[in-house]
Amino acid sequence: MPTNKHMKKKRLIFGIIALQFILFPTFAQDKLLGILKTELHQQMQELQKKEFPPYHMNYRVIDKHSSYVAASFGALMTQSAQHQRHLVTQVRIGNPSFDNFRNRDMGAIPSQNGIAATPLPIDDEGAEDAIRQAIWFETCNRYRFAVDFYQQALAEHSIQVGHEDKAPCFSPNQVEKYYEEPFSSEKIKEISAIFNRDDKIVNGNAAFKYYVERRYFVNTEGTEVVQNLPYALILVSGTTKADDGMELPLSLTYFAHNPDS
């Protein structure tokens, strides 16, 4: 018959494993890549009809998943999961030697933390139309900013001839194709197995944080890059008593960029 000690440990491990179904039900990121490629192609074609057609465009998406679970004396106390996604759009007007980035490092109005990013819906299956609408809307905004700053750059160029930086604004690179499979939720089970080897957990507190940032990049030259940036953090603290009654605390922290390590 299982002891109370073992039951507490099982509840803690079960809570951590169960979090995978909250945090990573299924990665549908392959569909997102297809949406980005299709929208980029369509928007580039449509903007070629404008007075100032772009010569280069790219989309960058940062898709963040994070989870946190904490337990005390084997009982689950807190668990949470977050998922957010942002799009950064770049539109270049002119040519590689002179474009809207000439006098603007960001090529458009930046936010406090750099170039402005816009939120994207996180449901690839149920909100595909909303994702496409958000991409289209942001591309239109970036294009308008690009035209404004390109015209400003032309005006400044006309009065600064001979005194401005001659370096090109853009250097084309070779086309890259790189794809990483979505990070498997099975990793959580493997990571949580560490608790099976440490009985001290049932006498104290444990916290587990898991984070995956999945990045997408596509451009009009044909580059496609999809990669994962994961990390795991486990904090364990416990207290035991020596034979003489003295309390002996123990705190351990485990961190890894790659949870396999």
Map each language-model feature to its residues.
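Bacterial N-terminal signal peptides
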Residues: 15-23
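Active-site bordering "gate/hinge" segments
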Residues: 27-261
